[in-house]
Protein backbone atom coordinates (compact mmCIF):
# COMPACT_ATOMS: atom_id res chain seq x y z
CA UNK A 1 0.00 0.00 0.00
CA UNK A 2 2.77 2.48 0.89
CA UNK A 3 5.48 2.34 -1.75
CA UNK A 4 9.09 2.46 -0.50
CA UNK A 5 9.87 4.78 -3.42
CA UNK A 6 7.73 7.42 -1.72
CA UNK A 7 10.17 7.77 1.19
CA UNK A 8 12.74 10.52 1.00
CA UNK A 9 15.44 11.59 3.42
CA UNK A 10 15.21 15.36 3.87
CA UNK A 11 18.18 17.16 5.41
CA UNK A 12 17.95 19.86 8.05
CA UNK A 13 21.55 20.73 8.84
CA UNK A 14 22.94 17.48 10.31
CA UNK A 15 19.50 15.89 10.82
CA UNK A 16 18.12 13.39 8.31
CA UNK A 17 14.32 13.35 8.33
CA UNK A 18 12.71 10.19 6.96
CA UNK A 19 9.58 11.46 5.18
CA UNK A 20 6.76 9.74 3.33
CA UNK A 21 5.62 11.85 0.36
CA UNK A 22 2.63 11.15 -1.87
CA UNK A 23 -0.03 12.85 -3.96
CA UNK A 24 -0.39 16.03 -5.98
CA UNK A 25 -1.92 19.33 -4.95
CA UNK A 26 -1.66 21.65 -1.96
CA UNK A 27 0.84 20.41 0.62
CA UNK A 28 -0.25 19.02 3.98
CA UNK A 29 2.49 18.14 6.49
CA UNK A 30 1.48 15.85 9.36
CA UNK A 31 3.47 15.64 12.62
CA UNK A 32 2.91 12.58 14.80
CA UNK A 33 3.04 12.35 18.58
CA UNK A 34 4.53 10.01 21.13
CA UNK A 35 5.01 7.06 20.86
CA UNK A 36 4.16 7.01 17.18
CA UNK A 37 5.63 7.24 13.69
CA UNK A 38 4.65 8.46 10.23
CA UNK A 39 2.53 5.30 9.90
CA UNK A 40 0.07 6.62 12.49
CA UNK A 41 -1.27 8.87 9.71
CA UNK A 42 -1.84 6.03 7.19
CA UNK A 43 -5.63 6.47 7.00
CA UNK A 44 -5.39 10.25 6.65
CA UNK A 45 -2.65 9.90 4.01
CA UNK A 46 -4.90 7.72 1.86
CA UNK A 47 -7.87 10.07 2.18
CA UNK A 48 -5.92 13.28 1.59
CA UNK A 49 -4.13 11.92 -1.49
CA UNK A 50 -7.44 10.61 -2.87
CA UNK A 51 -8.94 14.08 -2.40
CA UNK A 52 -6.25 16.02 -4.26
CA UNK A 53 -3.60 16.86 -1.68
CA UNK A 54 0.12 16.23 -1.51
CA UNK A 55 1.25 14.89 1.86
CA UNK A 56 4.63 14.94 3.56
CA UNK A 57 4.64 12.80 6.68
CA UNK A 58 7.91 12.56 8.61
CA UNK A 59 9.16 10.31 11.32
CA UNK A 60 9.74 13.16 13.75
CA UNK A 61 13.21 13.85 15.13
CA UNK A 62 14.20 10.97 17.42
CA UNK A 63 11.75 8.47 15.91
CA UNK A 64 11.87 5.72 13.31
CA UNK A 65 14.46 6.21 10.58
CA UNK A 66 14.95 9.91 11.34
CA UNK A 67 18.14 11.04 13.11
CA UNK A 68 18.25 10.64 16.89
CA UNK A 69 20.57 13.26 18.35
CA UNK A 70 21.78 12.53 21.87
CA UNK A 71 21.82 16.15 23.06
CA UNK A 72 18.62 17.17 24.83
CA UNK A 73 18.74 20.67 23.35
CA UNK A 74 18.50 19.13 19.86
CA UNK A 75 14.82 18.53 20.69
CA UNK A 76 13.89 22.10 21.64
CA UNK A 77 10.85 23.57 19.92
CA UNK A 78 12.92 25.77 17.60
CA UNK A 79 14.77 22.72 16.26
CA UNK A 80 11.53 20.77 15.83
CA UNK A 81 9.85 23.63 13.96
CA UNK A 82 12.92 23.97 11.75
CA UNK A 83 12.46 20.33 10.71
CA UNK A 84 8.95 21.14 9.48
CA UNK A 85 10.21 24.17 7.54
CA UNK A 86 13.02 22.06 6.03
CA UNK A 87 10.39 19.64 4.71
CA UNK A 88 8.37 22.48 3.15
CA UNK A 89 11.56 23.97 1.65
CA UNK A 90 12.48 20.60 0.14
CA UNK A 91 8.98 20.40 -1.36
CA UNK A 92 9.56 23.88 -2.82
CA UNK A 93 6.32 25.34 -1.46
CA UNK A 94 5.81 28.71 0.16
CA UNK A 95 2.61 27.83 2.03
CA UNK A 96 1.33 24.60 3.49
CA UNK A 97 -1.21 23.19 5.91
CA UNK A 98 0.09 21.56 9.09
CA UNK A 99 -1.58 18.95 11.28
CA UNK A 100 -0.09 17.79 14.57
CA UNK A 101 -1.24 15.11 16.97
CA UNK A 102 -0.18 14.75 20.61
CA UNK A 103 3.47 15.93 20.84
CA UNK A 104 3.15 16.93 17.17
CA UNK A 105 0.47 19.49 18.14
CA UNK A 106 2.85 21.86 19.99
CA UNK A 107 5.21 21.53 17.03
CA UNK A 108 2.33 22.53 14.72
CA UNK A 109 1.23 25.43 16.95
CA UNK A 110 4.77 26.79 17.26
CA UNK A 111 5.61 26.35 13.59
CA UNK A 112 2.55 28.43 12.72
CA UNK A 113 3.53 31.08 15.30
CA UNK A 114 7.16 31.35 14.22
CA UNK A 115 6.43 31.04 10.50
CA UNK A 116 2.99 32.60 9.91
CA UNK A 117 3.99 33.42 6.33
CA UNK A 118 4.48 29.70 5.61
CA UNK A 119 1.65 27.93 7.48
CA UNK A 120 -1.73 28.81 5.97
CA UNK A 121 -3.78 26.34 8.05
CA UNK A 122 -2.96 24.59 11.31
CA UNK A 123 -4.70 21.85 13.26
CA UNK A 124 -3.56 20.51 16.62
CA UNK A 125 -5.17 17.41 18.07
CA UNK A 126 -5.01 16.08 21.62
CA UNK A 127 -2.88 18.98 22.92
CA UNK A 128 -4.63 22.36 22.86
CA UNK A 129 -2.97 25.66 22.11
CA UNK A 130 -2.32 27.42 25.42
CA UNK A 131 -1.30 31.05 25.79
CA UNK A 132 0.82 31.47 28.89
CA UNK A 133 3.41 33.85 30.23
CA UNK A 134 5.16 30.86 31.81
CA UNK A 135 7.56 28.57 29.91
CA UNK A 136 5.66 25.55 28.46
CA UNK A 137 7.01 23.01 30.95
CA UNK A 138 6.08 25.27 33.90
CA UNK A 139 2.59 25.69 32.45
CA UNK A 140 2.24 21.89 32.21
CA UNK A 141 3.44 21.44 35.80
CA UNK A 142 0.92 24.05 36.96
CA UNK A 143 -1.97 22.54 34.98
CA UNK A 144 -1.29 18.90 35.83
CA UNK A 145 0.19 19.28 39.34
CA UNK A 146 0.30 15.74 40.79
CA UNK A 147 -1.30 14.00 37.80
CA UNK A 148 1.06 11.87 35.69
CA UNK A 149 1.78 13.62 32.40
CA UNK A 150 4.39 12.10 30.14
CA UNK A 151 5.76 15.40 28.81
CA UNK A 152 6.73 16.36 32.37
CA UNK A 153 8.00 12.85 33.12
CA UNK A 154 10.32 12.96 30.10
CA UNK A 155 12.04 16.09 31.40
CA UNK A 156 13.91 14.05 34.02
CA UNK A 157 17.10 13.03 32.24
CA UNK A 158 18.12 9.42 32.84
CA UNK A 159 15.16 8.39 35.00
CA UNK A 160 12.83 7.56 32.11
CA UNK A 161 15.39 5.49 30.23
CA UNK A 162 16.23 3.52 33.37
CA UNK A 163 12.59 2.83 34.23
CA UNK A 164 11.43 1.97 30.71
CA UNK A 165 14.43 -0.28 30.01
CA UNK A 166 13.96 -2.30 33.23
CA UNK A 167 11.14 -4.34 31.72
CA UNK A 168 10.61 -3.51 28.04
CA UNK A 169 7.57 -5.77 27.71
CA UNK A 170 5.83 -4.14 30.68
CA UNK A 171 6.78 -0.67 29.39
CA UNK A 172 5.37 -1.33 25.92
CA UNK A 173 2.14 -2.75 27.34
CA UNK A 174 1.76 0.30 29.59
CA UNK A 175 2.37 2.71 26.70
CA UNK A 176 0.08 1.03 24.20
Language model region names:
Residues 10, 30-31, 43-44, 93, ...:
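Alpha-helical interaction segments
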Residues 2-4, 17, 27, 63-99, ...:
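Flexible "cap/lid" subdomain of the alpha/beta-hydrolase fold that forms the substrate-access gate
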Residues 4-6, 37:
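A short helix-loop-beta-strand connector motif used in the catalytic cores of GNAT acetyltransferases and
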Residues 11, 49, 89:
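Short polybasic/polar patches that bind polyanions
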Residues 20-67:
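Conserved HGGG/HGGXW glycine-rich cap/lid loop of the alpha/beta-hydrolase fold
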Residues 12-21:
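A short loop-to-beta-strand scaffold at the N-terminal edge of the catalytic core in hydrolase folds
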Residues 12, 60, 127:
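Active-site donor-binding loop signature of nucleotide-sugar glycosyltransferases
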Residues 6-12:
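Short acidic-hydrophobic surface loop/beta-edge motif
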